[in-house]
């Protein structure tokens, strides 16, 4: 018998954590963190590190990795991740410790302990685990992200992590078709089961038109963006469309992520385009360079993607008042975020300061997740006998997906703390 327990991510987006227990091995898949409206961390359910045969990290976003170092205080289970994910996770861990105003169950020492236990893997690698096995496949979500195919006690289980079936400028789509169609269970995210993404070509065209129009009118473009994945995708999109007449600046943690990703071209769709994009971009190294960047027209890409902090707030205060400028939000904006406030009200309260924006405000759906139609096609790839467990999704979106697939074995009601048995 194999038990699959949801330690986090059941009926919610984020704090992803799945525990798979067989007769020989217990494998933890991700161990992420969410943050409440006040920035207080919300951790997955507890698991005893000494009981774990292995931990797999799908990618370096905090909602999948942010609680991991807390498991490396008194034990040291092996951690499997791509070398790119491991390096990106390090900067995310350290940034979280630096910026968190709340207690975290780890500090620098636990981060070092975590990284010492990394066993680097690449796409299509298979590792043996006391008679069971783990195979790692491209997830197409962010550079270095993996899906994991577990073969445990004779049962085959696919954990998607966050995945994207569609090709982007940065990445190839998820490698679904290397997975056998008759596996026993798919544990899949359904973050965006609430709708279908627009065609990528149309999205890029509208994004580039917004940038060009702003530049033609003498304005600058501010793009608040996620550090890992989104920043690089937008930079490549600009260079692909030859937007090189004004400087492109990268600020915040994104500039470090850019450098790390450049070391691992094997995880990119077009390494040459990536190198070209970095050549055309300029790093902001501090306040002196920020002031210089504002003297003339420019495109500035910087965290935080929802305007909850970071250098983006600095630029917003200085660029937001000019109608010639544009604020482009290329990511999901949570209802409690300043970015959402700007989209709906034209003003945002950030750090108890109300900021009114006269600049043009755009939102583009540059998602790195699969949409409803893709998720349906993904599920239909598998045999009818394959069980489907939906995680990392709101209850409403999970239900919507299941309604399209009523004949399938979809367990949409599992919440954090519940389990299924095979």
Regions found by a protein language model. Give the residues of each.
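Glycine-rich phosphate-binding "P-loop"
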Residues: 188-205, 223, 271-274, 357-373
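Short, solvent-exposed amphipathic alpha-helical segments in soluble enzyme
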Residues: 21-23, 150-153, 174-177, 203, ...
């Amino acid at each position: 018998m194999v038990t699959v327990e949801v330690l986090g991510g059941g009926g919610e987006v984020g704090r992803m954590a799945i525990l798979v227990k067989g007769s020989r091995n217990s494998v933890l898949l991700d161990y992420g963190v969410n943050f409440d409206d006040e920035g207080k961390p919300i951790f997955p359910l507890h698991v005893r590190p000494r009981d774990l045969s292995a931990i797999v990290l799908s990618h370096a976003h905090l909602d999948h990795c942010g609680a991991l170092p807390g498991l490396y205080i008194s034990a040291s289970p092996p951690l499997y991740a791509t070398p790119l994910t491991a390096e990106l996770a390090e900067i995310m861990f350290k940034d979280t410790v630096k910026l968190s105003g709340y207690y975290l169950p780890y500090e620098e020492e636990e981060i070092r302990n975590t990284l010492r236990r990394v066993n680097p893997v690449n796409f299509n690698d298979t590792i043996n685990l006391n008679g069971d096995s783990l195979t790692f496949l491209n997830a197409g979500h962010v550079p270095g992200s993996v899906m994991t195919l577990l073969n445990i006690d004779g049962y085959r289980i696919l954990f998607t992590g966050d995945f994207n079936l569609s090709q982007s400028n940065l990445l190839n789509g998820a490698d679904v078709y290397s997975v056998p169609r008759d596996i026993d269970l798919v544990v899949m995210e359904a973050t965006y089961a609430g709708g279908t993404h627009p065609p990528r070509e149309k999205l890029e065209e509208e994004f580039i038109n917004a940038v060009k129009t702003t530049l033609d009118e003498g304005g600058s473009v501010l793009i608040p963006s996620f550090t890992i994945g989104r920043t690089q995708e937008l930079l490549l999109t600009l260079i692909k469309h030859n937007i090189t007449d004004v400087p492109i600046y990268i600020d915040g943690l994104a500039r470090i992520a850019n450098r790390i990703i450049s070391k691992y071209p094997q995880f990119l769709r077009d390494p040459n385009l990536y190198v070209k994009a970095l050549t055309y971009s300029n790093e902001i190294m501090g306040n002196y360079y920020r002031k210089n960047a504002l003297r003339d027209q420019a495109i500035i890409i910087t965290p935080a993607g929802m305007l909850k902090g970071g250098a983006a707030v600095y630029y917003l205060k200085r660029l937001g008042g000019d109608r010639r400028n544009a604020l482009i939000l290329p990511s999901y904006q949570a209802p409690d975020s300043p970015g959402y406030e700007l989209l709906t009200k034209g003003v945002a309260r950030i750090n108890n300061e109300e900021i009114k924006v006269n600049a043009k405000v755009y939102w583009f759906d540059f998602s790195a997740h699969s949409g409803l139609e893709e998720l349906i096609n993904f599920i239909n790839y598998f045999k009818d006998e394959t069980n489907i467990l939906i995680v990392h999704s709101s209850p409403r979106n999970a239900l919507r997906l299941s309604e399209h697939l009523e004949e399938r074995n979809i367990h949409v009601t599992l919440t954090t703390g519940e389990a299924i048995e095979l």
